[in-house]
Amino acid sequence: MTVCRFWQQGYCRNGNACKFEHPPKGGQNYNRFGALSGSGQGMGGRVSEPPHYPGLSEDAIQKDLTSELPTWILSCYGPGRDAPEQLFGGYPREQSFEEIRLHFYNGLMAGNPQGALNEIQAAYQAAQQQIQNTLQNIPAAVQFILDAANKHPNRIDICRESSKGSSTGGSVFGRNVNPFQQSSAAPLNPFGAPSTPSTSAFGQPSPLGQKSSAFGTPAFGQPSQPVSAFGKPSALGGGSAFGSPQTGSTFGQPSVLGAKPSAFGQPAFGQPAFGQPAFGQSAFGQPSALGPKPGAFGTSAGSAFGASTTTAPSPFGAAAQATQPANPFGQPSQQAANSFGKPAAPASAFGQPSTTTAQNPFGQPSTQSSAFGQQQPQQAGTFGSPSLFGQQQQQPSNVFGQPSTTSAFGSQAATSGFSQLGNATSTIGASPAGAQAPASKSPYHPGSTRQHPDLLSYATKNPAGGLDTFKGKPVVYETPKGAAKPVPHIRQFDGTLVRIWMPDGAPAYTADTEAEDPKVYEDEGVKRQWQSFLEKGRFEGGMPEVPPRREWCVWDF
């Protein structure tokens, strides 16, 4: 329990009702962390008892991760006040809503918002898996926290070390009291980072040399087999029972420390940030912790999203020549800059690396590649192909193969069954590598030149023949009330299920769904109504009386 600072100064108006600890006064050498000092005797000559941390119990963990689980689960969790370790946290598990939003906008600027959404979905699912693994092993979770008291450096050691380093300069966040250790002589930084002059807030070196989170390695609840959302692979059985260090970068891309730019250590478009020079400066005007690096666009150093490009005279005036397959955040054969430039041994968000790794009983990483390094199938725009009305917009080539006009919410044909009014070939990508696309029946008129995307271009199947993923999202089968068999669904970020209505792909062509007289589709009023719906999401002049042409529709929903 935290010692009351007013009690240390000789007064406390709350007395025995104070929620902070009042240690006995006198000549005793009182140490709240006496169990960590290594001595065999405590006060009064008694044998030291194992440390006790208020709030660390199986019931508390069960309650925290079930009935009191917060809505935003991409956060750290450490039960027990002043405990030497937390169950899980640190990057990439510990991210704010604003950081996730920034990640999406980076994907949107790159022309591939759906890829960013898929990666965010993978991160959310990995966090859920950590929580479930913890709930299934609560006794081991408690023991993991207790064992961390004998592993150094732990969170308590880092707090002590940061108090020594705070005398060299002002902290980035100010000189505040450390919640894990009280010292009347030197107020501590609550983030556990030593303050060094002229150091960026997002890349402070640590005197302890510890990697991972500010309080040790993000510890607990890692899935044993599922892939980590942000790329933390390791060899199964290669580490101890509590996991192994991270070898992958933020989004599944390995990186050498100092070889690639940080998302906070370079300007977004090669321009000065807040009046600072463009190269080698942080986006917040501070020098980059990794040294001078080129801008993310228009250079051969690698795109900010992992796809290597050739040098272009202007970041927006020339189409990038991709040397690797287009991928939402790229996994080229050569190492490239990942989305947020994290090195192979990622530093803490608050700069506390570690020489040892606090092991995790639920942190058996997977040998599979990161969800952020998986090549995503190319998705079409929300409504598919170019317009029938001759207003095809020529967009600049993009390394991700995505039109820049894609919806900001990455719907991409996920919410509408209509494509652009036209007969051009669909832009949805080909089947995954190694997948043999079977000959499928066309839903369009036999004389139409338009082709419907094959089912395997946006979905994968399991050995049993059922759907495994659909547009990059995992598929679950649920049996609705009154139904005879389960039907496939995809799970949204909020946990709701959305039914897949066309699990077998497009149906065969039938003229029954079109107007009897095909000449009605030549009417400008009909074209204008459907074009308005495709562009704005609503009909011009009310609901049309003419059904859409088959060539205007897709069945990938």
UniProtKB/Swiss-Prot annotation:
Compartments in which it is found: Nucleus, Nuclear pore complex; Nucleus membrane
Superkingdom classification of source: Eukaryota
Tagged with keyword rRNA processing: no
Job description of the protein: Functions as a component of the nuclear pore complex (NPC). NPC components, collectively referred to as nucleoporins (NUPs), can play the role of both NPC structural components and of docking or interaction partners for transiently associated nuclear transport factors. Active directional transport is assured by both, a Phe-Gly (FG) repeat affinity gradient for these transport factors across the NPC and a transport cofactor concentration gradient across the nuclear envelope (GSP1 and GSP2 GTPases associated predominantly with GTP in the nucleus, with GDP in the cytoplasm).
Regions annotated as coiled coil: 114-141
Zinc fingers, C3H1-type class: 1-25
Self-association state and partner proteins as the record states: The nuclear pore complex (NPC) constitutes the exclusive means of nucleocytoplasmic transport. NPCs allow the passive diffusion of ions and small molecules and the active, nuclear transport receptor-mediated bidirectional transport of macromolecules such as proteins, RNAs, ribonucleoparticles (RNPs), and ribosomal subunits across the nuclear envelope.
Record-level GO BP terms: mRNA transport; protein transport
Domain comment, as recorded: Contains FG repeats. FG repeats are interaction sites for karyopherins (importins, exportins) and form probably an affinity gradient, guiding the transport proteins unidirectionally with their cargo through the NPC. FG repeat regions are highly flexible and lack ordered secondary structure. The overall conservation of FG repeats regarding exact sequence, spacing, and repeat unit length is limited. FG repeat types and their physico-chemical environment change across the NPC from the nucleoplasmic to the cytoplasmic side: SXFG/PXFG repeats are especially abundant in NUPs on the cytoplasmic side.
Name by which UniProt lists this protein: Nucleoporin AMO1
InterPro entries from the UniProt entry: Znf-CCCH_4, Znf_CCCH, Znf_CCCH_sf
PROSITE patterns from the UniProt entry: ZF_C3H1 (PS50103)
One matching Pfam family: zf-CCCH_4
Classification via SMART domains: ZnF_C3H1
Membrane topology: Peripheral membrane protein
A GO term for molecular function: zinc ion binding
